[in-house]
Swiss-Prot record:
It comes from Mycoplasma genitalium (strain ATCC 33530 / DSM 19775 / NCTC 10195 / G37). It comes from the Bacteria. The record marks 362 as: Required for activity. Its EC number is 7.1.2.2. InterPro entries: ATP_synth_asu-like_sf, ATP_synth_asu_C, ATP_synth_asu_C_sf, ATP_synth_F1_a_nt-bd_dom, ATP_synth_F1_asu, ATPase_F1/V1/A1_a/bsu_N, ATPase_F1/V1/A1_a/bsu_N_sf, ATPase_F1/V1/A1_a/bsu_nucl-bd. PANTHER family: ATP SYNTHASE SUBUNIT ALPHA, MITOCHONDRIAL (PTHR48082:SF2). Pfam families: ATP-synt_ab, ATP-synt_ab_C, ATP-synt_ab_N. One of its GO terms (cellular component) is plasma membrane. This is ATP synthase subunit alpha. Gene3D superfamilies: 2.40.30.20, ATP synthase alpha/beta chain, C-terminal domain, P-loop containing nucleotide triphosphate hydrolases. It is found in: Cell membrane.
């Protein structure tokens, strides 16, 4: 009996040793007021900025204001059941979103929850949406081209992997079209894409998703969607969710393209939240930290050095201007943050020029280092020629007495403008772009009437298809060697002769001499 008792005592002692008492300090606050998506809560003295707060009925919010006795919390989703006196509980964690390859082909909201009707996202990894951007020593300079498939951009304003290139312009000038065409052109190029719809109409987002599906681009794309019907807190959060999803692939050494469409609506949503939180307004009623809002977002797009995986995030933020005013507060802020801008203008768009990029005000500050050599060789003076044409074109409208030189510049300019026209959803390969530029640079287009340029471009793509030996050689070498240039000249002379022979009422003496094509 004594043995049995000793055995029980030993067992109890062992169990006592195993026992560890954990005290959980759960801070619970009380809602003082709730209105317009903002809750004022007392009793959460130790709450952290950007901390996730859990309310009754599974309602969540994020801490944006820390005051002496209360905290200001932006609420997500339907908060209609929240009342004065409702409880609020600290989660001791910041906002996180699911990340990983499971996000590809999915449409998610600003919280990373699926909204495409294809079931929940079975993510195994989550990452916090607010992070410090990689430091200078983790980065390297941009040295690889991101092929947009848009001739004007790849030739004149090349974008490199890891660059931030702003697309700025009035509404209905083709800004989104450029971004979507760039996503479509990443097919089979091992580039992951994230499209962030910020404050867009539901119908517009549905149209964009349909366009991506038709072009088989959704398999490497994630769409983060905070539409006009969502709360301002969701709109505010969406770009940070998008860049966090992109950073997962960046860490894996992959290349990512992210589009923010558009940051003007993002700034307006942040202004609304700030005013509701009673923060002091500044210029155009925006809060004082609206610059930091966009700089901390766009600085997370970068090109990492090889020690850190060598991945990249290329960002295409979009800004909408009012009546072409790029000197407004938000446009100038984002221009100063980014590595260049493409300025879209209504006058060119209405005149039928697609893409409607104004050459004079657009620039790419770092992309030229990443430009393909074949394209670089052919674009030497193209920007200058187009700038001269633009100036002379407006000048020539005032008088008809023009000297021969001016007439030549105008005629050449008209043909170049036709050559760089490009319909939506039809990106060009780098080889075809190089060949179009070759035709411009070596003045083969002077033999073609202006209204026949579009057909001539079509003829170039048909003639120099994937099986053509010149196409293969240029695709492999990625530059015009002396021998390749000579072969290409000969091929173009034959092509131009064949093309002009099909034209009716064509007189070569109006354009040049036949000897130039022999």
């Amino acid at each position: 009996m004594a043995d049995k008792l000793n055995e029980y005592v030993a067992l109890i002692k062992t169990e006592i040793k195993k026992y560890s008492k954990k005290i959980f300090n759960s801070e619970i606050g009380q809602v003082i007021s709730v209105a317009d998506g903002i809750a004022k809560v007392s009793g959460l003295e130790n709450a952290l900025l950007n901390e996730l707060i859990q309310f009754e009925n599974n309602i969540q919010g994020i801490v944006l204001n820390l005051e002496q006795n209360t905290v200001g919390i932006a609420l997500f989703g339907d908060y209609s059941s929240l009342r004065e006196g409702s409880t609020a509980k600290r989660t001791h964690s910041v906002m996180k979103t699911p990340v990983g390859d499971v996000m590809l082909g999915r449409i998610v909201n600003a919280l990373g929850e699926a909204i495409d009707g294809r079931g929940d996202i079975k993510a195994t990894e989550y990452d916090q949406i607010e992070k410090i951007a990689p430091g200078v020593m983790k980065r390297k300079s941009v040295n690889q081209p991101l092929e947009t498939g848009i001739l004007t951009i790849d030739a004149l304003f090349p974008i490199g992997k890891g660059q931030r290139e702003l697309i700025v312009g009035d509404r209905q000038t083709g800004k989104t079209a450029i971004a979507i065409d760039t996503i479509i052109n990443q097919k089979d190029k091992d580039v992951y894409c994230v499209y962030v719809a910020i404050g867009q109409k539901n119908s517009s987002v549905a149209q964009i998703v349909h366009q991506l599906e038709v072009n088989d681009s959704m398999k490497y794309t994630t769409v983060v969607c905070a539409t006009a019907s969502d709360s301002d807190s969701m709109v505010y959060l969406s770009p940070f969710t998008g860049i966090t999803i992109a950073e997962y692939w960046l860490k894996k050494g992959k290349d990512v393209l992210i589009v923010f469409d558009d940051l003007s609506k993002h700034a307006v949503a942040y202004r609304t939240l700030s005013l509701l939180l009673k923060r002091p307004p500044g210029r155009e009623a925006f809060p004082g930290d609206v610059f930091y809002l966009h700089s901390r977002l766009l600085e997370r797009a970068c090109k990492l050095n090889d020690e850190n995986g060598g991945g990249s995030i290329t960002a295409l933020p979009i800004i909408e201007t009012q009546a072409g005013d790029i000197s407004a507060y938000i446009p100038t802020n984002v221009i100063s943050i980014t590595d260049g801008q493409l300025f879209m203008v209504s006058s060119l768009f209405n005149a039928g020029q697609r893409p409607a990029i104004q050459i004079g005000l657009s620039v790419s500050r770092v992309g030229s280092a990443a430009q393909t050599k074949a394209i670089k060789q052919q674009t030497g003076s193209l920007k200058l020629e187009l700038a001269q044409y633009s100036e002379l074109d407006s000048f020539s409208q005032f008088g008809s007495d023009l000297d021969e030189n001016t007439k030549k510049v105008l005629e050449h300019g008209k043909r170049v403008m036709e050559m760089i026209k490009q319909p939506n959803g039809k990106p060009y390969s780098q080889v075809h772009e190089a060949l179009f530029l070759f035709a411009i640079n070596k003045a083969f287009i002077k033999f073609i009437p202006v209204d026949e340029i579009a057909k001539f471009k079509q003829r170039i793509t048909e003639e120099f298809n994937g099986s053509h030996p010149l196409f293969k050689e240029l695709s492999n070498k990625k530059e015009f060697t002396e021998d390749l240039e000579s072969k290409t000249k000969t091929a173009f002379k034959m092509l131009v002769k064949r093309f002009i022979s099909t034209l009716t009422d064509y007189d070569i003496t109006k354009f040049g001499s036949i000897e130039e094509l022999n």
